[in-house]
């Protein structure tokens, strides 16, 4: 898949100009990426996927690229101007094989609505074929399909678009993820808090969200005179807790954590399963500290973040670390930015972590470190983030009493290791292709009695497993054993216990694991102990199998 990233896509330009030649379609923006291009069209007509593909023919056009003093590039062709998003194209590269992948509605603003055509292009036909085959493979493991099959979540019509309902099986996965993060937070000295979902708009005006984030906020009035807003972020509420009492330099760092549910009113056309929703839960954390504490805190956060990612199998070359520096528009002094950036760099170097510098891509309120992960389908996802913030402490006039009795402004660090629990769950479902590690699996063991008369033995086995906190159910249906085994596999159950008359008489079990591994005559206690250890260690592979052989 790496070779695809080296192909610069001029296909988007060519495609947009083809659309212009159709007469009634007006491209307004072209986006060019590593593999994909998109064209936003202002059209009074409905464009179907088949019609779009008809326009996707390679032609040569005489166009001009006009760059203004801000670096924005416009494509000019036959008097038409089209905004170019993604940089100046290499006119020596001409992908000849491209495919239109999808058509969707794009909302650049509340007042505008465009048709977005998404495509991909390559210089070689084999590259395109390989890519389309890969895309088909990826679609088989779409988390929405897996979620429906495993009965994890749903998006009912009665709920607004982008609002998910987690079913019992899905909530088990979420709770396991949260329990693990609670352990991590406890090990770092966090104190868990709980904050309200609704606040006066005054809070969001102080924080700046009202000015910069209003379009994505849910705002409403009560008593015809007071405006309230549902939180899009947890940080302002954590700040209110910090401000609730006088803080001393000896108290710092103060670490708050929360599994906070936030709401962001994304455009309907941008919603996508659990990956893009309007309400989601963050494993949020905020640290209030002195400037001289930044480096040590960042080192702790980075080590723990890498430890967490490794538990899920993301390590080595499957993790990328990015350092984003001060953008042109920012707040804070040069001294503060230099001190914070130097602290991040020192922390990275002392931990011997390779990283890429993304110049001027930091937040306006401080530098940040992001962690990208690569899944089993070779896709990269931006996941964990650590952000230094000078802005909110200034806006809220946060203080601590220093050793000399003077009042000082603390620095704030935002961190989220999962990012969004819901989004990370979607990534894991696709990464593991529905076959989650045992510790995350909603059902960890399924008992399959061969005949009805063995059910009592099956019930006693379930009781034994439940005593040891193992999630278990039993399928004693009328279908054949082979069909029940297949159903358990489709349900993502990692271990099956098959019991017949012989197993009951001997007080043993036959254990079947993923990969068609079957071990007969296993002592029940031995199986339980091996499974408990596998779950406790959060093993990715079925380590209990090796202990049973």
Curated annotation (Swiss-Prot):
Question: What are the entry keywords?
Answer: Aminoacyl-tRNA synthetase, ATP-binding, Cytoplasm, Ligase, Metal-binding, Nucleotide-binding, Protein biosynthesis, RNA-binding, tRNA-binding, Zinc
Q: RNA-binding among the record's keywords?
A: yes
- Which GO MF term does the entry hold, naming one? ATP binding
Give the span(s) annotated as Catalytic. 142-437
Write out the residues that bind Zn(2+). Answer: 235, 286, 414
Q: Where in the cell is it found?
A: Cytoplasm
Cofactor dependency: Zn(2+)
EC number(s) of the enzyme?
6.1.1.3
Q: How is the cofactor bound?
A: Binds 1 zinc ion per subunit.
User: Which is one Gene Ontology cellular component term of this protein?
Assistant: cytoplasm
InterPro entries (UniProt xref)? aa-tRNA-synt_IIb, aa-tRNA-synth_II, aa-tRNA-synth_II/BPL/LPL, Anticodon-bd, Anticodon-bd_dom_sf, Thr-tRNA-ligase_IIa, Thr/Ala-tRNA-synth_IIc_edit, ThrRS_anticodon
Q: Which Pfam families match?
A: HGTP_anticodon (PF03129), tRNA-synt_2b (PF00587)
Q: Which reaction does it catalyse?
A: tRNA(Thr) + L-threonine + ATP = L-threonyl-tRNA(Thr) + AMP + diphosphate + H(+)
Q: What does this protein do?
A: Catalyzes the attachment of threonine to tRNA(Thr) in a two-step reaction: L-threonine is first activated by ATP to form Thr-AMP and then transferred to the acceptor end of tRNA(Thr). Also activates L-serine and transfers it to tRNA(Thr) but cannot deacylate incorrectly charged amino acid; unlike most archaea the editing function is found in a freestanding protein.
Task: Enumerate the PANTHER family for this protein.
Answer: THREONINE--TRNA LIGASE, CHLOROPLASTIC_MITOCHONDRIAL 2 (PTHR11451:SF44), THREONINE-TRNA LIGASE (PTHR11451)
The family database entries (HAMAP family) matched by this protein are listed as: Thr_tRNA_synth (MF_00184)
What protein family does this chain belong to? Belongs to the class-II aminoacyl-tRNA synthetase family.
Summarize the subunit comment. Answer: Homodimer. Probably interacts with its editing subunit.
Q: What is this protein called?
A: Threonine--tRNA ligase catalytic subunit
Instruction: State the organism named in the record.
Output: Sulfolobus acidocaldarius (strain ATCC 33909 / DSM 639 / JCM 8929 / NBRC 15157 / NCIMB 11770)
